[in-house]
């Protein structure tokens, strides 16, 4: 894990770093030097691939993946990793699926929002799900808007459909 692309994250420091993969690393993307320069870097004579994942390292060496840097929500100067919040929302026994994303906000740049679907027969509402999650995060990490939907929007391959989810929250 490299926080600034030049040195390793100190275990137990709480620093967030980019996951870098060494070893057999490609020379670059075909006819895309800009993307190649962002993804493949040489540090101290070794070549690394930076795939976009962010993580921390615990004092015992355990790596905690936080999520994709490109999905990170900057809200009032604080960084929120949606995948981390989604997993916490899904800890509620009634929540079947969840997506968290940023929506534009005049005051904070972005605000955290999300959608959840409830298990069949479940009766939880958005407030109950948020209350159960509140003890796990700082207030800026929690969705300011959380909408309960019949099905969380996903592509046929299971990937999150953030565009559709944002549209649901923008126009409930």
Which residues are covered by each model-predicted region?
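Conserved beta-strand termini and adjacent loop/short-helix elements that scaffold enzyme active sites
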Residues: 1, 101-103, 149
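Conserved ATP/PPi-binding loop(s) of AMP-dependent carboxylate-activating enzymes
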Residues: 1-40, 78-80
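Residue-level recognition of short loop/turn positions
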Residues: 2-6, 45, 59-60, 94, ...
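Hydrophobic "anchor" residues
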Residues: 7, 63-65, 160
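AMP-binding/adenylate-forming catalytic core of the ANL superfamily
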Residues: 22, 27-28, 38, 47, ...
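AMP-binding/adenylate-forming catalytic domain of the ANL superfamily
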Residues: 135-159
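Phosphopantetheine-dependent thiolation modules in NRPS/PKS and related acyl-activating systems
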Residues: 159-172
């Amino acid at each position: 894990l490299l926080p600034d692309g030049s040195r390793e994250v100190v275990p137990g420091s709480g620093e967030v770093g980019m996951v870098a993969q060494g070893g057999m690393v490609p020379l670059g993307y075909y006819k895309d030097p800009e993307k190649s320069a962002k993804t493949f870097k040489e540090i101290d004579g070794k070549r690394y691939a930076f795939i976009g994942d962010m993580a921390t390292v615990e004092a015992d060496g355990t790596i905690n993946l936080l999520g994709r840097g490109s999905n990170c929500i900057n809200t009032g100067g604080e960084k929120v990793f949606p995948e981390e919040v989604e997993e916490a929302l899904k800890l509620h026994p009634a929540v079947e699926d969840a997506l968290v994303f940023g929506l534009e906000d005049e005051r904070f740049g972005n605000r955290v929002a999300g959608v959840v679907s409830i298990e069949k027969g479940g009766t939880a509402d958005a407030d109950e799900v948020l209350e159960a999650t509140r003890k796990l995060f700082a207030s800026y990490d929690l969705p300011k808007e959380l909408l309960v939907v019949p099905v969380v929007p996903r592509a046929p391959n299971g990937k999150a459909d953030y565009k559709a989810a944002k549209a649901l929250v923008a126009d409930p």
